[in-house]
């Protein structure tokens, strides 16, 4: 079922990008699977999702960087490194980031959850998680032809015992068309 879902997501992207890679176009992908959480429920599927997505993207002509079970510092570093790779390839680059793991929103702000998160109270979550807008800002700082962010985030609040304001699922992200 996951392969069908991933396939259904990639078909429109493939059609959008064209069936054959353009000669001047570079396609870079960062695929992240977060499964081995230390203080919140582990998720077996993200590792499998990331592996399947890496294979599909490679078959679609992307140069894939795969990463799994990243701490907060590693997640931030990996996003920054990827943005640097995109910038180095130039403005004709197609950049795709796929994230599978825990994600949540608090008061309308989206967060991706690194494996080393260990909040003792709700106020710790934004400090220990990675804000989705920070990732978006980093990606938009690198000139590229197209940026795609795909999230397969678990909708269950992993911090239910300490966080009552975290919503189920992520908040709507309003991407600006043609953003730099």
Model-derived segments and spans:
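N-terminal signal peptide c-region/cleavage motif recognized by signal peptidases
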Residues: 19-21
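Active-site-proximal C-terminal subdomain of hydrolase catalytic domains
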Residues: 33, 45-46, 50, 54-58, ...
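Second-shell loop/turn segments in exported
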Residues: 36-44, 63-69, 120-126
């Amino acid at each position: 079922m996951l392969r069908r879902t991933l396939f259904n997501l990639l078909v429109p992207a493939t059609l959008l990008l064209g069936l054959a890679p353009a000669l001047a176009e570079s396609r870079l992908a960062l695929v992240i699977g977060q499964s081995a959480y230390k203080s919140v429920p582990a998720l077996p599927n993200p590792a499998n999702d990331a592996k399947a997505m890496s294979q599909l993207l490679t078959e679609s002509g992307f140069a894939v960087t795969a990463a799994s079970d990243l701490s907060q510092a590693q997640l931030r570093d990996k996003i920054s490194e990827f943005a640097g790779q995109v910038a180095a390839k130039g403005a004709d680059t197609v950049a795709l980031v796929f994230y599978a793991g825990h994600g949540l929103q608090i008061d309308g702000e989206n967060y991706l959850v690194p494996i080393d998160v260990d909040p003792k109270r709700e106020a710790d979550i934004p400090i220990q998680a990675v804000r989705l807008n920070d990732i978006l800002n980093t990606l938009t700082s690198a000139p590229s032809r197209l940026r795609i962010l795909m999230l397969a985030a678990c909708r269950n609040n992993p911090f239910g015992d300490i966080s009552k304001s975290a919503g189920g699922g992520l908040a709507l992200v309003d991407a600006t068309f043609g953003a730099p």
